[in-house]
Amino acid sequence: MTELLKISLPDGSVREMEAGATPADVAAAIGPGLAKAALAAKVDGEVRDLNRPFEGDAELALITSRDEEEALELARHDYAHVLAEAVQALWPGTQITFGPATDDGFYYDVKAPDSRDPFGMDDLPAIEEKMREIIKADKPLVREVWSREQLIEKWEAEGEVFKAEWAKELPEDEELTVYWSGEPGGEDSWLDMCRGPHLASTGKLDPQAFKLMRVAGAYWRGDQRNPQLTRIYGTGWLNKKQLNAHLHRLEEAAKRDHRKLGREMDLFHLQEEAHGSVFWHPQGYKIWRELEAYMRRKMDGAGYREIKTPQVMDARQWEQSGHWGKYRENMFVIPDEIPNTEDEGELVSKDADWMALKPMNCPAHVLVFKQGITSYRDLPIRLGEMGCCHRNEPHGALHGLMRVRQFTQDDAHIFCTEDQVVEEVRAFCKLADEVYRDFGFDYDVKLALRPEQRFGSEEDWDKAEQELRDAVAEAGMANDDYGWEELPGEGAFYAPKLEWHLTDAIGRTWQVGTIQGDRVLPERLDATYVGEDGGKHRPVMLHRAIFGSYERFIGILIEHFAGRLPVWLAPTQAVVATIVSDADGYAKEAVAKLEAAGIRVDGDLRNEKINFKVREHSLAKVPHLLVVGKREAEEGTVAVRTLGEKEQQVMSLDDAIAMLKDAATPPDLRDG
């Protein structure tokens, strides 16, 4: 008699099943409702297809739409496959590559047949219609294990150049899986190479819960030397209600787009002559300077000493630090040139002598620390820099202020003893909390743990990770109120890190602040201090930032506040606008008094209707408009219009100045 499999369920019960049984069989045995609702299964912690047989006794948790995170991941993966199937059905000869799920949808990279132009936006409606047809057909999604040779033969026979190339590089001993859409080998079946898992059939998707959004160029394997493909992006959800909510969020995000508002408010611009670098206009640079002054006050108060380090350093320094091997492709590298003695005036490169624009500030800060002899009594030493860095990001990855090539960090490094690490991290947690609260952000705290590729011993990593856990616990943040979570494999190559994820006004999250404890870089760059025993010891180096980069943080602020920045940050805090020319003299007097009080103010004395002026300054997001006419001039008053409010307040000029001074006071300088 065949021994039955013991399948343990989350409620503690155990189901006995015949050999060859699947999670779908367990769901059906429990009840028809669950059998219908089940989308996939978690078998011994691994997400699998519902119809994949158990391999022995197992722990089983069935995934339904209530398990939203896992359900969305599965659905989006399936939408990507349906997209590729639809494109090949509509345009035979299309070559497919790969298409993953993303944070809010999916994409697939494809190459159009030579007989037509690359796919464009005009093709999306037809693709969507074909996708709905495939979904409504409720085609089974069937997993099979193939050999490497089978895969290569299949893709070469069908002219799938990209898939064949990929298959040839797969390890011979790896279990290789394909998925059929439709009965395997059937007339209307479609095949793709994929690890899975997938839903049981295309009909498990909602045909009204996805939308194709855009197309973009992409290179095979992300290499510009390879053929160009078309990346088709879509968004996918579990139901139409979720899709509509997402599209509404996108509409709201478009209104808040920092690139659009940056133009309207005349803050900055970008252009092709300086890919990934920002041209700050006077209005935008006022925001920058306010943030910089704010951060300097916070860092001065927390015991940091500001330094300034070189933009360019010898490649040997980056080799020694380990960055050359890890970041070389993302560094701007230039030859260290000397005069050519044979042809005076021309420049040639010395062999193997290269310089690089710094992609980060850390090695330079170690070099500052190493100047002179440091005693344990001097520690901790906190070195801060508004450090300008450069990273050679691909053109396609650049995005306004959010992803740039030249950026400035509120960077700092703390050199301390082993015994000081937890207290320094705890103090940083407190400082970060103060800053984010000053800007009105809620946030989550995450711990990014060791990646597969890393420097340092396991003992060092164990210690560094535990120190961060202890510090967060002491700061009172290791709980659900702060969204505490550990992220395996997400740490830097030299250290684990704490991450701060801000939530903006429309619910999006932005990872900004970090702190990481590093024992690798001090070792590689031979940083030491003299201990109490008179011997040399390695300091622990804590890398930390709060804004992350000024460019990105300003972009986040613009979108979070939809351009309506807090008064203390607004480039122009008030405009005095006249109704009639008779009030010009009084308006100039008001502007002078406001400037004397430290308010950033302009006067608008143009011969234009007041409604025109109101609209113009509202578009520029000026927080307060002080309207003056003949009566106000005679009475020494102003009519104050606050951005976003319908009613205006009439008050004396002195009261208006007092109100604006209070509103314009940075949060860290307020009493109480």
UniProtKB/Swiss-Prot annotation:
SMART domains: tRNA_SAD. Residues 257-566 are annotated as: Catalytic. CDD domains: TGS_ThrRS, ThrRS_anticodon, ThrRS_core. Pfam families: HGTP_anticodon, TGS, tRNA-synt_2b, tRNA_SAD. Its EC number is 6.1.1.3. It is found in: Cytoplasm. The keyword Metal-binding applies. Homodimer. This is Threonine--tRNA ligase.
